[in-house]
Amino acid sequence: MEAVAAAEVTERKPDNDGVEPRVVHWGELSQTPIPSGPQEKETAERTPDIPNSGSSQAESPAVSAMLHAIAASHLPVCSQQQGEPDLTEPEKVAILGQLYHKKPLVFLERFRTGLREEHLACFGHLRGDHRADFYCAEVARQGTARPRTLRTRLRNRRYAALRELIQGGEYFSDEQMRFRAPLLYEQYIGQYLTQEELNARTAAPQAPRSGSPGTPAYPLSDLLFQSYQERELQQKLLQQQEEEEACFEEEEDSDEEDQRSDKDSEAWVPDSEERLILREEFTSRMHQRFLDGKDGGFDYSTVDDNPDFDNLDIVARDEEDRYFDEEEPEDVSSAELGGD
């Protein structure tokens, strides 16, 4: 009896491989491994790279396109601990595919905001379920309002980026704006600068450099680079002036009026208050130029595709309306009166 009891105790002891032999009864010698417990399964499901990333190759084209679209969006695919590395797109696609096949209704509920109308065909097998029908109808409504929603989101993100750049000060400095739009700068500001202001612009003061007392304040490399930038800017200015003159030559009827206005502008010298108004108008036009996406050297994808710019202060809404008045109430009322 003692030997049999010892044998039973031995049968209950798990080995190092994680395989726990089943409890045996009298005369039973089976040592079939038992399956993992529910906690182990839950832990495995939370692991981002459980599904093989190559399994997405077996998906239908419609399902694969849907999974990749959601993986590329800003929607979180799964919860992660702080400090964990971000999931790659193949890992996201694998996790999404696993959830779609195991729990399609949960998938639809969780990621419906990232779905488009063409993705609804992937949930045809859920038709008839009142919850699935409700979520699919919501996706269809989003598709109808999506262009306007995307346009509003785009302008809000650019406006938030504009405020950030204005606070930074560098992007909308005189030097940067002059380099981006030399002709516009010359028309509003450059032609009215005094000789002292021109000299200050040519040799802008720099912060003292550390080193020996004999170190020059303006190294040769900086002077050469500044000279190169100035030549490039002058070439750009000349090109824009030639393009503008070509446009004026096409309007032959107004040539005389243009010449008169040019003479008047040459004779007119604005005072300090008028120069301030010109500067404000120039800066406002540069702001609008940025919002319209006309700054060729700026990577707008860093703003348009960045959800971090979605949080706008409610206090700034009034100021935002100055830039984005898509419909003027006076225009609408006048159109209605004209129709009567």
Curated annotation (Swiss-Prot):
Keywords: Acetylation, Coiled coil, Nucleus, Phosphoprotein. Residues 1-62, 200-220, 239-272, 289-310, 321-340 are annotated as: Disordered. One of its GO terms (cellular component) is nucleus. The keyword Phosphoprotein applies. Residues 9-25, 39-48, 260-272 have a biased composition (Basic and acidic residues). Disulfide bonds: none annotated. Residues 241-259 have a biased composition (Acidic residues). The modification Phosphothreonine is found at T47, T215. It is found in: Nucleus. The modification Phosphoserine is found at S272, S334. Residues 50-59 have a biased composition (Polar residues). It comes from the Eukaryota. Its main location: nucleus. The modification N-acetylmethionine is found at M1. It holds the Pfam family CCD97-like_C. The keyword Phosphoprotein applies. Residues 229-258 form a coiled coil. May play a role pre-mRNA splicing through the association with the splicing factor SF3B complex which is involved in branch-site recognition. Associates with splicing factor SF3B complex, involved in branch-site recognition. PANTHER family: COILED-COIL DOMAIN-CONTAINING PROTEIN 97 (PTHR31840:SF1). This is Coiled-coil domain-containing protein 97. The gene is Ccdc97.
